[in-house]
């Protein structure tokens, strides 16, 4: 590609269901290629299927791209020189193109029913499931008029060329479909509504798309699109044929293609768990591409600087949740403390989690958990002890730590902490170590395990002394007293 070439790529989902990680991976590769080349990223909505499309799904697509920071240069909400960018608003354009294809002899009206096509195959000794047999190509005007008189409504089909259809795929290399392997295909329904095989290439042509980066599941449709491009060029709708790159499939468990039924395919489930955009985008980038053999962790800016579609692997990529989680944890650690606190606060607010801390205290709480979590949702499990309404004693932790031997430990801890004047981490640490390590001569685990469980409800928590400072004097003492009472009750004879 020369520097004078202007790259124009597009992301053109249908607004059905919730955004799928494979779909977003395709968007990411298109976006990164546009940004790498200084080109244009076009966002287009393919919403011509009124039975399946929904406004909620359309809004979810906008939400997904905005959350991930993949801004578009042309498309819904912002417009552009080749709008409108929703296919449902472009029907007059498709009608005009169909009329021009018919007038030029590039397409024709086909009246055959599926039953008639199957019967002709059987009569000729062919497989009845071969598909359309090009029977209507050369109907006379009288025959067409007779079919119309019967009330038949034709579909419009493209007249496929009797030549091999070859392209050099930017991911898979030279690919050829031999002449005759693809029958004349429908551009419209019988009611005249345009179909995907027409509208997708027409929009690409009119929007001057130069590179089509899409999933490999669409590879079989490429010869039809090449043939249609040839016709569109001849009637003056298209200037040229774009370059194609078919991206590898994303597999799920058992090496089966990741489907919408697989939980990990739902982009918003990852967001709800607490993935941050940097972590998820880093992982999605690795589904078919790598920045270097020994370099899995990178920023979006680093990806943009390095991304070339020619480097995309053709082999299927497997979605590995553990690997995705690990990368997200690394990106959480890379955030500066103030930014992490901001994001964690926003996540807690969205999910209704309350800590009762002021901004400075919350920033400190966030600092304590930043290196201890994989997703933002993990932080609530570590910090929910700060909310009295959410505080509970974990049964396993209590059974292990709040036993008979915990009674004197918690008693000594209470006595020591009641004498602390300045309720801060250093004073709390000094008091507890003096009472439990120095005077009772306990090992740290035996000394602090019961205190941790009594105060936070769990054996797993942020650092103990800092946690007690955040909890405050009164609540800390009340929790330790309740923990001592629990231990005493557990030790008392039953019956």
Curated annotation (Swiss-Prot):
Stretch forming the signal peptide: none
EC numbers: 6.1.1.17
Keyword set includes Secreted: no
Gene3D superfamilies per the UniProt record, alphabetical: 1.10.10.350, Glutamate-tRNA synthetase, class I, anticodon-binding domain 1, Glutamyl-trna Synthetase, Domain 2, Glutamyl-tRNA Synthetase, Domain 3, HUPs
Catalyses which reaction(s): tRNA(Glu) + L-glutamate + ATP = L-glutamyl-tRNA(Glu) + AMP + diphosphate
Main location: cytoplasm
InterPro entries: aa-tRNA-synth_I_cd-bd, aa-tRNA-synth_I_codon-bd_sub2, aa_tRNA-synth_I_cd-bd_sf, Glu-tRNA-ligase_bac/mito, Glu-tRNA-synth_I_codon-bd_sub1, Glu/Gln-tRNA-synth, Glu/Gln-tRNA-synth_Ib_cat-dom, Glu_tRNA_lig_a-bdl
Subcellular location: Cytoplasm
GO cellular component, one term: cytosol
Residues binding ATP, per UniProt: 260
Record keywords, A-Z: Aminoacyl-tRNA synthetase, ATP-binding, Cytoplasm, Ligase, Nucleotide-binding, Protein biosynthesis
Annotated motif 'KMSKS' region, positions: 257-261
GO biological process, one term: glutamyl-tRNA aminoacylation
GO molecular function: ATP binding; glutamate-tRNA ligase activity; tRNA binding; zinc ion binding
Motif, 'HIGH' region: chain positions: 13-23
Top class in the EC scheme: ligase
CDD domains: GluRS_core
Pfam families: Anticodon_2 (PF19269), tRNA-synt_1c (PF00749)
Subunit (UniProt): Monomer.
HAMAP family: Glu_tRNA_synth_type1
Family: Belongs to the class-I aminoacyl-tRNA synthetase family. Glutamate--tRNA ligase type 1 subfamily.
Protein function: Catalyzes the attachment of glutamate to tRNA(Glu) in a two-step reaction: glutamate is first activated by ATP to form Glu-AMP and then transferred to the acceptor end of tRNA(Glu).
Protein name (Swiss-Prot/TrEMBL): Glutamate--tRNA ligase
Gene: gltX
């Amino acid at each position: 590609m020369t520097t004078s070439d202007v790259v124009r790529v597009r992301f053109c989902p249908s607004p059905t269901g919730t955004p799928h990680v494979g779909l977003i991976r395709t968007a990411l590769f298109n976006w990164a290629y546009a940004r790498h080349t200084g080109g244009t990223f076009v966002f287009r909505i393919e919403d011509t299927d009124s039975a399946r499309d929904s406004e909620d799904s359309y809004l979810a697509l906008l939400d997904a791209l905005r959350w991930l920071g993949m801004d578009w240069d042309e498309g819904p909400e912002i417009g552009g020189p080749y709008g409108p960018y929703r296919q449902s608003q472009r029907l007059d354009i498709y009608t005009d193109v169909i009329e021009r294809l018919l007038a030029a002899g590039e397409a024709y009206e086909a009246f055959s029913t599926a039953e008639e096509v199957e019967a002709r195959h059987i009569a000729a000794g062919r497989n009845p499931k071969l598909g359309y047999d090009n029977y209507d190509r050369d109907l006379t005007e009288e025959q067409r008029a007779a079919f119309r008189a019967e009330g038949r409504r034709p579909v419009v089909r493209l007249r496929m060329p009797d030549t091999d259809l070859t392209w050099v795929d930017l991911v898979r290399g030279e690919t050829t479909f031999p002449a005759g392997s693809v029958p004349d295909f429908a551009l419209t329904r019988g009611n005249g509504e345009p179909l995907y095989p027409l509208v997708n290439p027409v929009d690409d042509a009119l929007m001057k798309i130069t590179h089509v980066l899409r999933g490999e599941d669409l590879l079989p449709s490429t010869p039809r699109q090449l043939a249609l491009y040839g016709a569109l060029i001849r009637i003056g709708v298209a200037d040229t044929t774009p370059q194609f790159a078919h991206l590898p499939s994303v597999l799920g468990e058992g090496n089966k293609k990741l489907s919408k039924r697989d939980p990990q395919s739902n982009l918003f489930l990852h967001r709800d768990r607490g993935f941050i955009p940097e972590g998820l985008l880093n992982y999605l980038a690795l589904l078919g591409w790598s920045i270097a053999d020994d370099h899995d962790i990178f920023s979006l800016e680093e990806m943009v600087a390095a991304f070339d579609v020619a480097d995309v692997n053709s082999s299927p990529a497997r979605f590995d949740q553990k690997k995705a989680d690990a990368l997200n944890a690394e990106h959480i650690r890379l955030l500066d403390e103030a930014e992490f606190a901001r994001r964690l606060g926003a996540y807690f607010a969205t999910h209704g989690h309350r800590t009762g801390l002021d901004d400075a205290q919350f920033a400190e709480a966030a600092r304590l958990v930043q290196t201890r979590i994989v997703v933002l949702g993990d932080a609530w499990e570590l910090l929910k002890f700060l909310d009295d309404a959410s505080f509970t004693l974990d049964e396993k932790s209590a059974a292990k730590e709040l036993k008979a031997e915990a009674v004197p430990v918690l008693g000594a801890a209470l006595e020591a902490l009641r004498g602390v004047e300045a309720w801060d981490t250093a004073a709390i640490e000094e008091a507890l170590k003096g009472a439990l390590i120095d005077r009772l001569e306990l090992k740290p685990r035996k000394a602090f395990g019961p205190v941790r469980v009594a105060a936070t409800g769990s054996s797993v928590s942020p650092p103990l002394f800092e946690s007690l400072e955040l909890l405050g004097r009164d609540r800390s003492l009340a929790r330790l007293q309740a923990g001592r009472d629990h231990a005493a009750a557990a030790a008392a004879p039953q019956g």
